[in-house]
Amino acid sequence: MVPAVNPPTTSHHVAVIGAGAAGLVAARELRREGHSVVVFERGNQIGGVWAYTPNVEPDPLSIDPTRPVIHSSLYSSLRTIIPRECMGFTDFPFSTGPENKSRDPRRHPGHIEVLAYLKDFARKFKMDEMIRFETEVVRAEPAAENPKKWRVESRNSGDISDEIYDAVVVCNGHYTEPRHALIPGIDSCPGKQIHSHNYRIPDQFKDQLNSGSSVSGVDISRDIVNVTKEVHISSRSTKPETYEKLSGYDNLWLHSNIETVREDGSVVFKNGKTVYADTIMHCTGYKYYFPFLDTKGEVTVEDNRVGPLYKHVFPPALSPGLSFIGLPWQVILFPMFELQSKWVAAVLAGRFYSKLEASCIPKRYTHLMAELDSQFVYDNWLADQCDYPRIEKWREQMFYKVFKRIQSQSSTYKDDWDDDHLIAEAYEDFVKFPSNYPSSLIEREYTS
């Protein structure tokens, strides 16, 4: 997908909130359209959630609203669920090369490699000159003197800045503010409780129970299983009678949903089984959270639905001055970020603008692309709006293949695959682009 040269368009002064993958590609696409861009990043480096830290929050459940917030939810051994070939931006392949000896060459690399890729991307497109590091947006709202413009208040080392922008693009991610399941009796549990947001390494666990059976929840369970006596996974998506030992492990069980937690530390499942847990880890996902955003009620978050939004991006009453990148989940994230960003940049420039409509989709799963096909319908719609090539067929098929492998070989899918023909197709496309890795690699140690 070689990007086209865009004709002269209207230029705007745009604030991008967040310098993770979404914020980086949004800034690039906005600048390509001729906009003036400032990226606000509260951390001291790019990467967003991919910037790993061993630090955790003092409140292990992350409930206390006054707690110091740790942005990243990565654990030390995390590897990508999606293969690198289909994970990268369309014109900046997440490939490997023989010259990159210190890099992680695995198809499902660790988080260090993803951050290195994003740093390469930022270096390639000279992103640092647009980013204000250690600068937190504390308030963004329509300007009182001109509601079509946006007032952005930011803080850096105690200094407050107040600026006016033509538009705000929200790219702050949604893997920082934990969600918690409503479990009867959970408040009386005498054992330790932790949300997976604060999980880093397995050494601290003994008898462990995980509430939540998403792919990441199961991966964490496998990370813990070798250092703990037993791990029991609770899943609300299984049948009530579910009770099975997971293949390849003698101490890892899958249960149905939790019925109740008792004061003696016992946990009763819907299947009738009872276990005693030293620790309950809540692998229950995250909330959409925009504490800095004041839209005077035009955009709300209710039951984990951000709305009303047109195509997950523009709130009709505030478009095109306010937009969101990256809300859908269970998708191939980076290419979707890229296509959404192209659309936002083009709409702000006065190209491809279509009338925005309020969404009437049921709330909780508004941003879930539950049907595997739905994300590609959406991505291709975005591509069509921008006169950009549609998502490659090999990328679609690779995504389908990995989800089949997750279901059939969940413990080995990251290291055992049968889609070499798709890898070959991907690398045939990748040769259209210059190497995405600079000659001098990022200076850091990589431990596989």
Swiss-Prot record:
Keywords, sorted A to Z: FAD, Flavoprotein, Monooxygenase, NADP, Oxidoreductase
Nucleotide-binding as UniProt keyword: no
Family of the protein in this entry: Belongs to the FMO family.
Pfam families per the UniProt record, alphabetical: FMO-like (PF00743)
Its EC number(s): 1.8.-.-
Cofactor: FAD
MF-aspect GO terms: flavin adenine dinucleotide binding; N,N-dimethylaniline monooxygenase activity; NADP binding
Function: Catalyzes the conversion of methylthioalkyl glucosinolates of any chain length into methylsulfinylalkyl glucosinolates.
Superkingdom as given in the UniProt entry: Eukaryota
Enzyme class (EC, first level): oxidoreductase
Binding site for FAD: G18, A19, G20, A21, A22, G23
The protein's name: Putative flavin-containing monooxygenase FMO GS-OX-like 10
UniProt binding sites for NADP(+): G212, S213, S214, V215, S216, G217
Cited InterPro entries: FAD/NAD-bd_sf, Flavin_mOase, Flavin_mOase-like, FMO-like
